[in-house]
Amino acid sequence: MAKDFVTGRKTTFGKKRSHALNQTNRSWKPNLQKVRILVDGKPKKVWVSTRALKSGKVTRV
């Protein structure tokens, strides 16, 4: 399962509740994109969330 290289965000799991309070499993997935960034001075392709890209936590190479 893919995980954000910068923030560590990954798929979270929970329940979907209907009006009758029935429950089924569901998941929330972060919007991950594979991008090239500098890691220890070398370019590397890693999974990064779009939230981290928009906030400027990483810069593309």
Swiss-Prot record:
InterPro entries: Bacterial_rp_bL28, Ribosomal_bL28, Ribosomal_bL28/bL31-like_sf, Ribosomal_bL28_bact-type, Ribosomal_bL28_sf. Pfam families: Ribosomal_L28. GO terms for biological process: translation. Residues 1-26 are annotated as: Disordered. Keywords: Ribonucleoprotein, Ribosomal protein. It comes from the Bacteria. Belongs to the bacterial ribosomal protein bL28 family. This is Large ribosomal subunit protein bL28. It comes from Ligilactobacillus salivarius (strain UCC118) (Lactobacillus salivarius). The lineage of its organism: Bacteria, Bacillati, Bacillota, Bacilli, Lactobacillales. The gene is rpmB.
